[in-house]
Amino acid sequence: MPQLKIARAVKPAELGYTMPAEWEKHEATWLGWPHNASDWPGKFETIPWVYGEMVRKISADENIFLIVRHKHDENFARRIFTHVGVDLRKIKFVTQPTNRGWTRDTGPIFVRKAESGKRKAETAIVHFHFNGWAKYDNWRKDTKVPEIAARLLRKKLFHAECNAKPFIIEGGGIELNGRGTLISTEECYLDPKIQVRNPGLGKKEIEATLKNYLGVKNIFWLAKGPNGDDTHGHIDDICRFVNAKTLVLVREKNPRDENYKPLAENWERIQDLRLEDGGKPEVVELPMPSPLYFDGVRLPASYANFYICNAAVIVPTFNDPNDRVALGILGELFKNRPVVGINAVDLVWGFGSLHCLTQQQPDLGRRQTPSTN
């Protein structure tokens, strides 16, 4: 493995790095091959086939880094991909033991410094540390993934810290427009008692650290996420930017549903959001599917958990009448990308979906403008 370049004394923002928006061009997508059957008890056998469909769609116009535990997993993945028609030349297998495959939260988070004069554009990796969503005990293998990625890609690695302690944030807990605004939830990162990621840190310190490591200037807090989310309020089930000035926000129309009040509160709060330039964003309503249960457990089924790749926008669907409605709304917002549904009924039994499994690696080129969505 190449020698690792670790930057500790300076923060990414000081060097001009910022986190690009998801719709900007990708060099690759990172995924972790599913192997922890306890994440999908009773349904694990179907999950590799969902991955096959995801990889087929994503790899149409970008490379895939797929984290596997060993050669057996790699060979199994190759068989699945061959069956569904994936071009294996687009897949780079990365052998690294992991606890789970939720790469949005455990994988490398990339920041980029733009080209300036004789200075070339470059990307680096921020290691926001991971503690199993402050809920599970088996996470120590997962926390090594960003370092492995930095070594493999020969990228500079920034270890996120606050008050000389590792700073914990998951990729699914932050949503950015690539121009300076970040949205998260109080439930996820400001709750002082439940699933506490950074004990002892208050809102001011958390915001300052996010600004230092992601290059954002403007942070806005929604309240809570939908019931069934075992991450305790990840934003990627609630609210997503589709371009620099437009976002979708989920809404529950049934007043008897347990999600009605918390999601309604988010709609009240979003009226106060101002972007980094002081402007007010356009907010588009995204419906919720009917409640989805398995073994009596409510699952965090949400159309907001879509992933924007170069070739398409892949959207979780749930055999629900609102599948078509959600796909239609997103199709109107992403004019220049096909919007494609992927059945996620079994996948969401793992308490996550398409966005939770993916992590984008931005291209070094110029950012795409919102009109190219």
Model-derived segments and their meaning:
Residues 2-368, 373:
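The feature marks the mature, well-folded catalytic cores of soluble enzymes
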